[in-house]
Amino acid sequence: MDKKTLNTLEYNEIKNKIEKLCKSKLGKSIANKLEPMIEEDEIRQSLDETYEAMSMIYKFSNPPIYEIINVKASIMHVSKGGYIVPEVLLKIGQILNSVHDIKRYAGESDENYENCPMIMAMMDSLVEEPDLVATINNAIISEDEISDNASRNLARIRQTKRQKTENIRDKINSILSSNDQALQENIVTMRDDRYVIPVKVSHKSSFKGIVHDHSSSGQTVYIEPMEVVELNNELRMLEAEEREEIIRILKEISDRVYDVKDSIFVDQDVLSKLDFIFAKAKYAIEIDATNPKLNTNGYFNFKNARHPLLDKKKVVPISIYLGDDYNTLVITGPNTGGKTVTLKTVGLITLMAQSGILIPVDENSEVAIFDNIFTDIGDEQSIEQSLSTFSAHMKNIVHIVNNITFNSLVLFDELGAGTDPTEGAALAIAILRIFLYKSIRTIATTHYSQLKIFALTEKYVKNGSVEFDVNTLSPTYKLRIGIPGKSNAFEISRRLGLDDDIINNAKEILSQEDKDFEDVLSDIESKKKQIDEDKQRQLELKEDLLKLRDRYEKEIEKTKLEKEKIINEAKENANEIYMRAKEESRELINKLKFLEKESDARTVANDVENKFNKRIKKSSNKKLLNETSKKQKLQLGDEVEILGIEQQGTIVSEPDKKGDLLVQVGILKINANVKNLKKIKEKEVIQSSKSIKSIIKNKANSDIKSEIDLRGKNIEEAIYELDKYIDDCVIVGLKKVNIIHGKGTGMLRKGIREYLRSDKRVKKIEDAGYNEGGLGATFIYLK
């Protein structure tokens, strides 16, 4: 990639921002060496890695990556008989600690492997060494201190040292206390790593010992008393022994590190890369970046692109595309209107994407991969001092023309400026034609009207302009494709106070052709602005309609859910009523089985169950209230009709506080409330009695078989029928029955047997014999 372009577009500023977000020196080193790539697969992988890392940060926050240094040279030094110093061992421990933490950073859910496969694969490649980490942490305290726990021998040596030092101090303190007059100071100090005392020169001869030093004034000599010379010698020997033991420990740990060097090298490289990738992800979050589409067709489409180095709260987004129906874009408009920023935005965003950096554009933007990007952007401060403005630009253009490739992007700022306008415009058109005929993607900014006409008349060339608000005399920085811009020199001058006569005179000097062209531009601009405003209103209206539609859809969904809730609650209530009624029926049936006239009892029980079901159906449709019962007085022995089940009976208990009492209906006693009772006359009682006897007589002969066939039914249907069948069997007194369920898959047999095991009415379950159905049937014995 052209080095001048990288500097002009401030590519290094982007690298610096990413480098600062790296946690480790190795990560920073990768960021510092970053350059744009040209292979699509490499770029796609790098962008996707960054996008995955960004997703993880949003979900799990920043990863636990610590300081990582290059430990390879230190580890390889072990192979030459050396050892690793404590400082580097601590760094190796830090690398391994980071491996441990980052492998647990996101967990190992299927969702992570599906959404972030590349980052998860990198994390999986990390190798943990827990035993080595424990050894390092146990042995190394700091960069220059080894723990007593490193070995038993080291602990013993240091304990002996402490005792020896204490002995020396005791000896010297004894000497100090008995020779106070001879001492310069009553202290113990060190010279040449040996304990000495400061003695006045005048008393030097009164001390037996070795002189190690004297003061700068010559008044003090530092003497090692003979009484401690041997102790000092022993202390020195212990220190030497300590150093040897420390080196032995370091070599032992170093050998263990060397044994797993390949794993540590992988960990170092992967952690460094992860550090760099997550730094790119953090930067992407800062600039609200997205993951663009890529192509090698020379087509790019940036939607609401923002220059990443400008304040994102103030920068005005631009939407720009090139390489589809046109290859050359000519941008015109006033100075400071945003033309140069547009060029730099296009160039820098392209460089970022080709470097695997997510870009500040809206979703579904597309980036073209270029072999090279050439720029001629700058002002007089950036131009070589020895050349004129025009010469400096032209020298740069010559370099571009000589080095251009088919798959290049060229960005010209004020092409043809710095010389005679007529000649400059002609040169600019000729240069643009060179690139146009080679289908090289080119964007150029200019003030020349000739280039506007060139863009209007030449195929595959399009005009563009930066918008200027003449009312506020300020640029809006909005880019418009397809519309040439105006300089607005006359309007700006008038609003700034220039006399109208001067402005009118200037207009007269213009050729009629220039006037007509400017009028056309003004008309186009006005109409374009009106179209844009209409389009914006349509978009707002569409947005309002969409919001309204969404609101109504939500209301409909809410109503639907509420309806379903009401229905479900009603079903639950109905089911509860049914189950309660069924339980009451079962209790009645259990009482009836003790009666002598079993067939009559079954008739009454079935009739009661049917009446209960009838009552349930009625009570779920409307609330039953007996208004007349409130006015009548009921007492013990009264004949009444129970509303809802159409049965008659005799009151056999006094009502409680709630109005509940017992009514004798034939051989049954039924709970009822006075609200649901109606007093009846004697004639009605006689008719009812006859009716009940008639029912019993008609149903007494009903035939209950000793087997039931449940084949072809699902488990729920089979159990429902079986439950009713067992009730009937209990009433008529059958003790052994055969349940035919068939063989099939065995699921029906299994479901029925599970139900029977929980049924208290069943005394015993046994398989049918071979000639009785085998596995396709089950015999049960009832209590």
Curated annotation (Swiss-Prot):
Keywords: ATP-binding, DNA-binding, Endonuclease, Hydrolase, Nuclease, Nucleotide-binding, RNA-binding, rRNA-binding
Annotated ATP binding sites: G333, P334, N335, T336, G337, G338, K339, T340
UniProt-recorded Gene Ontology molecular function terms: ATP binding; ATP hydrolysis activity; ATP-dependent DNA damage sensor activity; endonuclease activity; mismatched DNA binding; ribosomal large subunit binding; rRNA binding
CDD domains referenced in this protein's UniProt entry, alphabetically: ABC_MutS2 (cd03280)
Short name of any one Pfam family annotated for the protein: Smr
NCBIfam families, per database record: mutS2 (TIGR01069)
Family the entry assigns: Belongs to the DNA mismatch repair MutS family. MutS2 subfamily.
Name assigned to this protein: Endonuclease MutS2
Annotated ranges, domain Smr: 708-783
Classification via InterPro entries: DNA_mismatch_repair_MutS_C, DNA_mismatch_repair_MutS_core, DNA_mismatch_repair_MutS_sf, MSSS, MutS, MutS2, P-loop_NTPase, Smr_dom
Highest taxon in the source lineage: Bacteria
EC number: 3.1.-.-, 3.6.4.-
Function field: Endonuclease that is involved in the suppression of homologous recombination and thus may have a key role in the control of bacterial genetic diversity. Acts as a ribosome collision sensor, splitting the ribosome into its 2 subunits. Detects stalled/collided 70S ribosomes which it binds and splits by an ATP-hydrolysis driven conformational change. Acts upstream of the ribosome quality control system (RQC), a ribosome-associated complex that mediates the extraction of incompletely synthesized nascent chains from stalled ribosomes and their subsequent degradation. Probably generates substrates for RQC.
GO annotation terms (biological process): mismatch repair; negative regulation of DNA recombination; rescue of stalled ribosome
Subunit structure of this chain's protein: Homodimer. Binds to stalled ribosomes, contacting rRNA.
Species for this entry: Finegoldia magna (strain ATCC 29328 / DSM 20472 / WAL 2508) (Peptostreptococcus magnus)
